[in-house]
Amino acid sequence: MNHTRLVHNVGVGALEWLHAHRDGFRLELDVDPEIGFLERFKPVGELALICKVLFREGVAGSRQATLARQLIEHAWCHTLDGGRMLVRGQRAEPLSPIPFEVYLPFRELGYSSPEAERAFRLNHRLDSYAALEMSPVRRLGLSAFQRRFGLPPRVPEADVVGATWLGRAPEPWTVEGHIAYDITHTVFHLTDWG
């Protein structure tokens, strides 16, 4: 088996497994208090992002594209309740960027929630939103998401990229786990996950 076929088979298997276990993405309201309500949105956002890239790059076969569309539809309609869970999350933590970051790939795939978008636009105008303390790569990601949404980034990407590990270009032999994660995400944010 060649490497391309192996990678394809792993991807197909992963997508089929996710589809078969899609009910596992539900958001229980009586979650363990040690796990934040908004933190549980992240896997749903990752799912939407992965499916968006699959569609954009045209790398999924017709069966995989159908499964991916069904996964996204399920996540939007059942897990996020048509965006209402994101609105609830934004109301619970108005300064959290998580509902916005989860929403954007769904919006780019054609889903919308006017109520969520109103909340995101309102919060975007707050000075507290721009003043949130976060790592440079996290700030770069948020600025990229704001640009993709059509909002002027509160902190321009060009002003942030130089503060990232990759932007500072230190000694490459010092890369370790967290740094490698930050490097890959710097590239992801600058290339829209390309």
Label for each model-derived stretch:
Residues 1-53, 61, 69-73:
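Low-complexity, Ser/Thr/Pro/Gly-enriched N-terminal "stalk/linker" regions
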Residues 2, 11, 58-62, 112-113, ...:
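Serine/threonine-rich low-complexity intrinsically disordered regions
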Residues 54-90:
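Post-signal peptide N-terminal segment of secreted/secretory-pathway proteins
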